[in-house]
């Protein structure tokens, strides 16, 4: 259910941006996977521009990447990320980039973290969330950065995704596990 995931993040970020004077540029970095790609790259920029806000959007992503892998990459400096940055509507892309370089690339106002969709309702898969959050806060050039959670919602009830078995192919079980 990419639509719900995207909607939640966009809604949250738009509220965050809405209170900001339009003359200020708000810098948002997503650390995630293909769901973050959809949410921040395909929708957020246009929504903010429509209300007169200016954004710099960064997306550090690895398709299907779980939190534990993001944490391992932070510890090892592995150059595993595709990093896309949108400034003034122009997108630049860097491949094989490490997380520290991306986080230090700008004075991010907001950094979102995201679990791989299929693990989002499994609490034991969040073992390194606090460390990852503390890590990005520590190395971000903006000492007042807000770290937010990008919640991935349950797959469609008729999903054939193999990981849906973790939730007995039931959206309700998945959604309740995220509460």
Predicted features and spans:
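Boundary at the C-terminal end of the N-terminal hydrophobic targeting segment
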Residues: 20-24
